[in-house]
Regions:
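Membrane-interface helix-loop junctions in multi-pass transporters/channels
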Residues: 1-119
Length: 119
């Protein structure tokens, strides 16, 4: 089981680095759009994967762990979200920090619900 989680985490982490970087460069600086997009797509995927796991009894516990704990856990990042929020506050950008927290929370919940209902 641990190897499945480790492999999923590795793929998720590399995916986060690539997707977050591309989105951040395309979106410009000043707002952590790369991390926001990664966390929203990761929330959607987690909802989708969990719904798929419920609807697909042949999905083994190992592959479920690979997709959810491994890939989604490695792909999404609460620590980076927290750091970027603190950085915005320390820079005096309180409204951006508040918007980032609000958008992250509300949209991540919506993305998870959408993913769950899509599967």
């Amino acid at each position: 089981m641990l190897w499945y989680i480790a492999a999923g985490s590795a793929i998720g982490g590399v995916s986060r680095y690539l997707v977050g970087g591309v989105v951040q460069r395309a979106g410009g600086s000043g707002f952590p759009i790369g991390t926001l997009v990664v966390n929203l797509t990761g929330s959607f995927l987690l909802g989708l994967f969990l719904r798929y796991a419920v609807d697909t009894p042949t999905l083994t516990p190992e592959w479920r762990a690979f997709l959810t704990v491994g890939f989604c856990g490695g792909y999404t990042t609460f620590s980076t979200f927290s750091y970027e929020t603190v950085a915005l506050m320390e820079d005096g950008q309180w409204s951006r920090a508040a918007a980032y927290v609000g958008l992250s929370l509300v949209l991540a919940l919506a993305a998870t619900m959408l993913g769950s209902s899509t599967g």
